[in-house]
Curated annotation (Swiss-Prot):
The lineage of its organism: Eukaryota, Fungi, Dikarya, Ascomycota, Saccharomycotina. The chain crosses the membrane at residues 15-37. The active site is at 108, 116, 156. The gene is LCL3. Residues 59-217 form the TNase-like domain. This is Probable endonuclease LCL3.
Amino acid sequence: MAPIPPTPAQDISILHPKVLLLSAGITTSLFLGYRFYTRYVRRVRTYLDLTPSIIENNKKLYGYVTRVGDGDNFRFYHTPGGLLMGWGWLRKIPTTRKELKDETLMIRLCGIDAPEGAHFGKPAQPFADDALNWLRGYVDGKYVTITPYSIDQYKRVVARAQIWKWTGKKDVSAEMLKTGYAIVYEGKAEAEFGDNEDWYRKLEAHSKRLRKGVWSLGKKLTTPGEFKRVHYRGE
């Protein structure tokens, strides 16, 4: 009995449906893997990791507040993916200053200015401690979502910060304006509001009418911007 001849090899074109399907599958897998990595794995450690696309596309970053340093800024440790990626139970969030070195963003709350604390031998403004204590109680040691808008001259990330409370998601800048412990940011060159400037100004006007916080000072009020111009810039 004659042997069965082998099946001749077939040359498959790169345009063959099977090849195209396989290529599409590999490309899709790589793309989804990259998206998963950038969204849920890769950390933004410092302001140097903030790419133009993150800022231009208003990408939200989820993370943990490690320290509140002033009435309108705090340290933010990025935890991509949050609890679903093990943060807080499988993946440890650093707590010591040494561990946190070069691992956090300094966040400057957008659209507002809080009373200046005592710095460099200069006196604190009225309500500076109230603003600091309020912000500590509201966000310190808690998870927040930030939307970076820009990086200022001090390498701080000017951002909108939002936090979940029992009554829903809250805008931290807006809540500070409601208390009267902050005013709408006066500087024009570095002002960042997102789409919320009109809303912020209405909240400020309401607190002013009720004479809440700094507005209780009446004509004695020196705004944070004025205070900095006099005490730090010698104007």
